[in-house]
């Protein structure tokens, strides 16, 4: 995925905001 937020430990394009 392209949008990765390491501070939250999630992958936006894979997991989504929810």
Curated annotation (Swiss-Prot):
Cystine bridges: none
Keywords, sorted A to Z: Cytoplasm, Manganese, Metal-binding, Oxidoreductase
Record's GO cellular component terms: cytoplasm
GO MF annotations in UniProt: metal ion binding; superoxide dismutase activity
EC annotation from Swiss-Prot or TrEMBL: 1.15.1.1
First-listed, main subcellular location of the protein, grouped into a coarse class: cytoplasm
Catalyzed chemical reaction(s): 2 superoxide + 2 H(+) = H2O2 + O2
Cofactor(s) essential for the protein: Mn(2+)
Cofactor, free-text remark: Binds 1 Mn(2+) ion per subunit.
EC top class named in words: oxidoreductase
Cellular localisation: Cytoplasm
Family: Belongs to the iron/manganese superoxide dismutase family.
Primary role: Destroys superoxide anion radicals which are normally produced within the cells and which are toxic to biological systems.
Assembly, per entry: Homodimer.
Name assigned to this protein: Superoxide dismutase [Mn]
Organism of provenance: Mycobacterium simiae
Lineage: Bacteria, Bacillati, Actinomycetota, Actinomycetes, Mycobacteriales
């Amino acid at each position: 995925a392209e949008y990765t937020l390491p501070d939250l430990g999630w992958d936006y394009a894979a997991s989504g905001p929810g």
